[in-house]
Amino acid sequence: MVKSQRNGKKGAKVLSRKEKRQSEKEEMDSLRQRIEEYNPEVDEASIKHFSDLPITQNTLRGLKECSFVSLTDIQKKSIPVALKGEDLMGTARTGSGKTLAFLIPVIEILLRNDITEYDGLAALIVSPTRELAVQIFEVLAKIGKYNSFSAGLVTGGKDVQYEKERISRMNILVGTPGRISQHLNESVGMETSNLQVLVLDEADRCLDMGFRKQIDNILNHLPRTRQTLLFSATHTDSVQDLARLSLTNPKRIGTSSDQDISAIPESLDQYYVKVPLNEKLDVLWSFIKSHLKSKILVFFSSSKQVQYAYETFRTLQPGIPLMKLYGRHKQTSRLETTVKFSQAQHACLFATDIVARGLDFPAIDWVIQVDCPEDVATYVHRVGRSARFGRQGKSLLMLLPTEEDGMLKRMKVHKIEPKMMNIKEKSKKSIRPQLQSLCFKDPVIKNLGQRAFIAYFRSVYIQKDKDIFKVDELPVEEYAASLGLPGAPKIKIKGGEINKEKKNQSRKLLQLSKADENGELKEDDDKPAKVRTKYDRIFDRKNQTILSEHYLNMTKSAHGGKDDDEDEDFMTVKRQDHELVDDELPDLLLPVSKRQAKKALSRKATLASKGNPTKLKFDDDGVPHAIYELEGEEDFEKAGDAKQQKMEFVQKEQEAMKITDLADREVERQKRQEKKRKRKEIERRIREEEWDDGSGMDGEDLPDLERDMEPTEAKPKRTSNWFDDDDDDNDGGDEKHGNGKPPVKKAKSDSKYVEFEEPETLEDLESLAATLIGN
């Protein structure tokens, strides 16, 4: 009876599994049919909630737990098209839900293709920044927790070896271009032949020059039969970029209001203010002091400016928590700052453009742009951190008088018209005296100020739009004074038209222009005298130790060990590269360029132009022949029939192989004997160690080794002798003392040394000490 009940339960379990698999199969078939029958023009109006989409129940369950119920415009238009397997280019406002627009199709496509953990990588999601990659991975983990996929996050700043050991088991991989490219080159287990979907979030940033090398490397490893999804707030129309991605008839998806204007949220209030360069920090300080109950995000153009503003404002204590976030930061610190700012109710974050794209900081009240963005697209992404998902938000852009006209014209083309804001003089407070005091007291703050000054001017110099960014019209001294610096630091910007002209000039003409009438080189007196600073004098100090010039000259190592003392030279070079009287003389001039001099000193470079060497051998008659000379046809026929020569050659080689085989067998036999001898030696040592300990060894405790050879008998243990002599070694006998006293030392009167073994008792030590004192 019990057995029948068990069989009944087992049968019910098997039946339930079959029914479950059958129901899942029927569900997937119905979803495929709904996706194939979907018509965007007809069915788009009927889709308002996630439950109306042709997606699985597990995905709906995860969305419901995360409180995702209604669809946004970009989600309503892009998800059904992506589910049909078509390439997609999605453009929508910032904060409109683009992350779910590509995560849901990724999960559903993998489910329809029956991807398991044993199928390897099936979906790759690329993000331009680490913070955005972390945010995408967190959303994926929440909505896909009821599915059986394995997902991984790979970004810079983490342990590469830890990721390599687990990356082969990932079905969905989220990461930054640099780390994904590194794993494709180095990780053995990262196989991309089964890849189904490639997603580029913030596609225009991923495809620009900053990530060109990494993206090209990633695309070279991926199969062409994949589905590609591109999402961004600002799209790219570059034919070259789209050709790199190998898109096949991509569908362009954009909300109705995004077709002709940029993706600025409607609930965002935009303002701009015209501020001189030397008053920017004063305006920023006054703004923060008047908005202590707000959540503020401040953008600078360089990380050095972020560090300087953070350190100085933190010292001045405005009354609101301050944070900083920029690229050259440890990954742990960046994540901590991101989490703290997301959870804070009132805070101020100084950041660079690293947080301008994709990051979702909840409830940001103000976005302040202290420095002008490089283009309108950067402006759109910056202000998009506020007014997300229909919330209210405000933005403020600080423009210099030289930047106002050009930037407003660029923004007007994209139908962006911020309102002008006037700042009352009584509400503006100057912090220049405090900054000067900080720079005077703390050298670290002063150094940060100098680096921030240089970084700002370099950022303006490298901008492409010269109608907006005019570096020549910037007030240098006034800006340095506003940072609290005693003077403007010297800015060294590499490149420029002067360097290009020097590079294109002929080296010989340049050298001839420096020669006088006699052809001798003259020094350039036009160069201004170099100003020697305190730091130059510190680094130019002569060493007074063994590295001093005097010591090196004494050891003849100051110039590579060569003896080139000027007093001993009787021939000196007066001039070079001058015309000789006799034109028929060979060219024996010194090399006029560094490249020629390097080639002359390099043996490898000298031999490169001489061709390959030839080797000859001489026969008995003294006729030379090439060492690898082929035999002629006539000589071959003289030797006899070809078949006969073949048989003779084979027979000769067989005899040689027999001799070689005998030698190999002998070597193998010697190796076996040596291995056996070592094994016996190990066995003998083990046995001796056990006997020395006095415990002995039972037969069952001995190692199971072969006993082909007779075991060597262990030497009997010698009785301890404390003081021996050369004569005692010849006797070979042991003396026993019944009184327990140590034996009397037997040594020659003229012996200078005392030989003894290790004492074991207190009496032995006393006897040894007495003997040593007597000697």
From Swiss-Prot:
Endoplasmic reticulum as UniProt keyword: no
Domain Helicase ATP-binding: 79-253
A GO molecular function held by the record: RNA helicase activity
Superkingdom, natural source: Eukaryota
Compositional bias segments (type: Basic and acidic residues): 21-30, 637-671, 704-716
Pfam families: CTE_SPB4 (PF13959), DEAD (PF00270), Helicase_C (PF00271)
Keywords on record: ATP-binding, Helicase, Hydrolase, Nucleotide-binding, Nucleus, Ribosome biogenesis, RNA-binding, rRNA processing
Entry's localization field: Nucleus, Nucleolus
Residues spanned by motif Q motif: 48-76
Annotated Basic residues bias: 1-12
Broadest EC class assigned to this enzyme: hydrolase
Family: Belongs to the DEAD box helicase family. DDX10/DBP4 subfamily.
Purpose of the protein: ATP-dependent RNA helicase required for ribosome biogenesis. Involved in the release of U14 snoRNA in pre-ribosomal complexes. Required for pre-rRNA cleavage at site A2.
Record note on domains: The Q motif is unique to and characteristic of the DEAD box family of RNA helicases and controls ATP binding and hydrolysis.
Protein name (Swiss-Prot/TrEMBL): ATP-dependent RNA helicase DBP4
Species per Swiss-Prot/TrEMBL record: Lodderomyces elongisporus (strain ATCC 11503 / CBS 2605 / JCM 1781 / NBRC 1676 / NRRL YB-4239)
